[in-house]
Amino acid sequence: MNHQATDGFFFQHKSAIIKYMIRFGTGGFRGVIGQSFTKENVKKIAQALANVYHQENAKKPICVGYDFRSLSLESSVWISEVLLGNAIPVLLSKEPTPTPTIMEESKRFGNEFGVMITASHNPFNFNGVKIFEKDGMDAEKPLTDRLEKEISSLSGIKECSLEEGKRKGLLKENYPLEDYLNNILSFVHIKKKTPQTKILLDPIYGTGTLTLKKILTSMGFTNINEIHGGRDVKFGGLLPNPTKDNMEKDRAFFLKGKYDIAIGTDSDCDRIAVLDEKGEYVDANEILGALYYYLIAYRGMKGDIVKNIASSDLLDALAHKLGYVCHQVDVGFKNISAAMKEYDALLGGEGSGGLTMRGYIFGKDSTFATALFLEMVANLGKPVSKIIEESNKFAHFDKIVVEDSLSFENTGRPVYW
């Protein structure tokens, strides 16, 4: 049987591959590499997007980016070639980036659409395609439904090489990270310089290794160490998600090094996790709650907060005590972003570690969240545990954790990611 090897993966020849349906979930299209995530399917998604682009009479370039995963770079080229073949201008990143970088770029240029190649926090053998709408917002269901319908009725795929796209003036390539980081810095207001704060970073071999240390250094922090940095398409055997289990694996190293705070991020750097100065895991709801309290009580900002149904009532209690409203939406960060626009909310986030702020991008971003959290730590001059304690105490909130598990019968029906 014929096989192709890429980054240590072995894929069966296309004649042996089952035809998988392309379905978009709350985080875009995701699939196992060599099964549903194939060159053929990636190009189908690009052609469907091209069709919708022309149906909407869109005019601006489509920003295309990619992360560290296997086939991400190649897929960004496949996407671009199809868009160029449909006479659509493309702004293609020349460097791997976090997902929020392409969202920020799309928003900054006011683009109608954007594309990011990533499977976010999924295991190493997955990859995916995220589509962004106007101003860099995650694609909503009406758009993804249209894309699925277009895919099911495609009669062919138009393509154009990158070289030809350049000759036609349709393709521009750039390095978006610098502008992205400068935009984050415009939201940061540090009054107290605390370069001695000892910070441990764990990007879990994801694109956070490109941004976290840079942003903190620009903010004046100098005592920074990173573990699990650089690119490893298998993420060192770890699930590339800063879960409590993953963060607690860093605890011994953290305590031995006498760090003040640890920050963990997922593979495309849109989720954040924190260890306090005792090496204790800080719940994502408490991160969001502390930041909301800080922005209103200490920075004098105003506004409601948005959470999803999987988030804690801590946020409701805080909002009530502060004189604002906590709005609850369904799972999916695009629902949080939509509600933030509707209510002009100050902050929005979810219990899995994603958050954003009014005026910033319409999507979660852990580089931004890291900068905001370390601003809070610096300005308040308190250990992380005391900051969390203060916001919880203000809300009269106590946390009781009860762990349980569920099991499901294997029906043999396919599951789409």
Ranges and model annotations:
Residues 261, 301-417:
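Phosphate-binding and adjacent anionic-ligand microenvironments
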Residues 1-3, 8:
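Targeting/processing segments of secretory and organellar proteins
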